[in-house]
Amino acid sequence: MVTVLTHATVFDGTRFLPGTRDVVIDGGRVTSVAEGGQGSHDAADDHIDCTGKTIIPGIIDCHVHLTSSGAAASSNFHDPFSLQFFQSVANMEATLKGGVTTVRDAGGTDLGAKMAVETGVVRGPRMTIAVNIMSQTGGHGDFHLVSGADSPFLAPHPGRPSGVADGLDGVQRTTRELLRAGADHIKICSTGGVLSPRDDPRHSQFTEAEIAVIVAEAAAQGASVMSHAQGAPGIKNAVRAGVRSIEHGIYLDEEAIDLMLERGTYLVPTLQAPQAVIKAAEAGAGLPPSVVEKARRVIEAHRESIARAHAAGVPIALGTDAGVGPHGENLEEISLLAEVGLTTAEALAAGTSVAARLLDDNQVGHLSEGGLADLVVVDGDLRTADVRGIESRVNAVYLEGELV
C-alpha cells in the first residue's frame, strides 16, 4: 500500500521546505516529496490529510538507557534480574511512540536486545549499543556501594561484561571485551556524575592516557567513543584523547569549547537528565540526598554551558539520558534546546541531521526521495508555531513506512 501524507509543512532535517508538500511512502522508503496536492492522484493509495501539520524525519536520540526505567533504582535490589529486559520492551515501544526511531544506547542494552529488534521478535527503534559503561574503580560507572553491596544497575551478565577497569592494560582489555560482546561504540566516564552519590561531577576520572588507549582500541574495530563528561578538566582530557562526543558538558569552559571546535567533537547535552532526577525526587523516589542536591546545583550551569557552546558553533546532537527519566518523553529535549538559544530549525536538526552525522549514518536523519520512511507527524506548523511543547504534539510516527 502506498501512503501519501498530503499538504504538510516539511522539515527535511536541515531546513523547512517552501510551501506545503505531499510525502509519498512506498516499500519503507520515501518515493516523492512533491508540491502539496501533486504527490499522487491514484485513488487506490492511502491519502492522509496533514494540513496544519509538520512532518519531520524520525528523531535520533544519541543517549538512552533502554534497560533502565527511572532514576529511582532502589527497587532494582528487590526485582528479579531478568525484569529489566522485559521492561526494556515497553521502553522501546514508548520510545517509538514518542517519535524516536533511532537510538544510541549508552549502556545496559546488550546484543540480544538489538538482535531481537532487528529480527522482528520485538518492536523498537533501530539502535547502536555500548553494552556497558566503562569506568575507573570508584568512578561514575562503578556501582559497588560503600555498604559493601553491588547495585544491580548495569550488573554484569554473560552478554554485558563489567566496564570497570584501571590502567593502560586494564582499559585495553575491557574495551576489547565490550567490543567482543557486540558494542558498536564505547561509553566511558571521564568525570564524576550526578547519580553516583560519592563523586563530584567536576572531578576527572580516567587519565588522558587511559582514554587514548580506549579510543585507539575502539577505532581499530571501526568504533567511536562517547564520554560522560561534566567537569571541564575531564571534558578536555576526553577531547584531547579523541572521543567522538561529550555527553552532558555541564561545566564547559572556553578552553574546552575551543578544543571541541578544533577537534570536531560533538556535544550531546541531555538537558532532561538533571531535571528528571529532581522530578523523581519530588515524586517520592528514594534517591540519596547528595544526588538530589547535585542535580539541583547543576541545572543552571548546564543551561549556560550549552548556550555558550551553541553560540561558539559546537555541533550539538540530541540526547536525553532516557532511563534516568521516562522513556517516550524524548522530544522534550527539543523544547529544552530551544530554551537555551537554538532556533527551531537548529533544535530539530540536532535530533535529525546532526545526530545522523554523529552516528555516521546517512540512512537516517533526513527526509528526502529514496530515504528511509522514518517520519514523525507533529500537530501545528513548526515554521510559525513555537517548537516548545513538541513532545505533546506527536500525531503519528512511521518506522520504515509502517505506522507505529
Predicted segments with their positions:
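N-terminal metal-binding scaffold of metallo-dependent hydrolase/deaminase domains
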Residues: 1-42, 53-55, 381-385, 402-403
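Divalent metal-coordination and catalytic microenvironments
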Residues: 8, 23, 28, 52, ...
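C-terminal cap of metal-dependent C-N hydrolases
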Residues: 8-11, 351-353, 357, 369-404
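Metal-associated gating/positioning segment near the N- to mid-region
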Residues: 53-119, 137-144, 209, 233, ...
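Non-catalytic positions within long, well-ordered alpha-helices that form the structural scaffold/packing
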Residues: 89, 96-97, 179, 239, ...
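Surface-exposed amphipathic alpha-helices with a cationic face
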Residues: 114-117, 211-220, 310, 338
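Metal-coordinating catalytic core of metallo-dependent amide/deamination hydrolases
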Residues: 121-290
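His/Asp/Glu-enriched, well-ordered alpha-helical/loop segment
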Residues: 220, 285-381
